[in-house]
Curated annotation (Swiss-Prot):
One of its GO terms (cellular component) is cytosol. It comes from Sulfurimonas denitrificans (strain ATCC 33889 / DSM 1251) (Thiomicrospira denitrificans (strain ATCC 33889 / DSM 1251)). This is SsrA-binding protein. InterPro entries: SmpB, SsrA-bd_prot, SsrA-bd_prot_CS. GO terms for molecular function: RNA binding. The lineage of its organism: Bacteria, Pseudomonadati, Campylobacterota, Epsilonproteobacteria, Campylobacterales.
Length: 150
């Protein structure tokens, strides 16, 4: 993985991540420019399957002031994901199970400077699971603090 552009931190907190995939995105030139400028947010975004194809919904890619309105893009529009058919079929089967979904994790430039998105098959966490994660995180932080003193 190359340079990280945006990360969906909420997905790491709300879901158990099972299997990760790398996907390409179908984007316009104005969207690429906005992504390079860092005007992207994956919070509240999700992935749906429409007629055997994967789409990213509700991902915010802001407009640049320098882009002419004729070439401008939708800020929260749907964007097609580029995946192999076997990967899409695997994800569709996983989503059909109860409690499973596909979530976007992070947007980044790969080694060839192409925008990629990392997505994962995920299972939703219960409230007690989230509490346990927070407790473990606090304990780990306290341990590191105490180790730092010695």
């Amino acid at each position: 993985m190359g340079e990280n552009i945006a990360k969906n931190k909420k997905a790491y907190f709300d879901y158990f991540l099972e299997e990760k995939f790398e996907a390409g995105l179908v984007l316009k030139g104005s969207e690429i420019k906005a992504i390079r400028a860092g005007r992207v947010n994956l919070k509240d975004s999700f992935i749906r399957f429409v007629q055997g194809e994967a789409f990213l919904f509700n991902a915010h890619i802001g407009r640049l002031e320098t882009t002419h309105h004729f070439y401008a893009h939708e800020e929260r529009g749907s964007r097609k994901l580029l995946l192999h058919k076997k990967q899409i079929q695997k994800m569709i089967k996983a989503v059909e199970k109860d409690g499973y979904t596909v979530v976007p994790l992070q947007l980044y430039f790969n080694d060839r400077n192409i925008v990629k998105i990392q997505i994962a098959i995920a299972k939703g966490k219960q409230l007690h699971d989230k509490r346990n994660d927070l407790k473990e995180k606090d304990m780990k932080r306290d341990m590191e603090r105490s180790m730092k003193d010695y």
